[in-house]
Amino acid sequence: NVHFLWAASTMEGMSDLSIESAIKVSNYVSPEQIRNIPFLEFFHTIPLLSYVRFAKWDKVFSYERPDDDFKFSNSIFNYALSVAHAANGNLLEANRFQSMILNDIESEEVNAMVMAGHPTKSLMKIASLLASGSIDMYSSKYSEAIASFKEAVTIQDTLPYTEPPFWYYPTRQTLGHALLMNKSFEEAALVFERDLKD
């Protein structure tokens, strides 16, 4: 199962295999299949998720925006662009893309994915919070970033159990990093310990 290979290689930090597997999974799903089975749209987003995970910003910047009727894909596209711009110091563009992540959260297309059993709205909210927190991190606003990341962790903890998980990495890792940057070492240790237990 190439989807599991993508998830495992992403978790293990094997960037080349993660990206290769992500592209394969994405190519397996056609636009026509997504229109017939809405939750399959998730598989179209995973190359972007790999690019973000491994800081392949050039790949994010050159990625073609999905068709407008693929609302979840556009949300993840905006998330990826927001984080990439923040990492490159372009905070105006980072904020612009972050502001668009939840634009279509009540759309017919997103509701169809939710009705099919996919926690699409929760994933969009996590993406929005992570992008917002990333912007604050690159602005050295660690307290604000920590607040966003804590909220993202709370939402991720409510996601239904599945393998691979619905969100592509444990957001506690991002929270722990922000706590370290804020010199909140004891709290960071607790967050990383909880992540290992989960």
Where are these regions (language model features)?
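Start-of-helix signal in alpha-solenoid helical-repeat scaffolds, especially tetratricopeptide repeats
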Residues: 41, 73-75, 82, 119-126, ...
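"A position-specific structural signal for the A-helix of alpha-solenoid helical repeats
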Residues: 4, 46, 76, 80, ...
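Extended catalytic-interface subdomain
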Residues: 2-29, 41-55
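Solenoid-like repeat scaffolds
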Residues: 26-35, 63-72, 100-111, 116-121, ...
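Residue at a conserved register position within TPR or TPR-like alpha-solenoid repeats
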Residues: 8-9, 51, 85, 136, ...
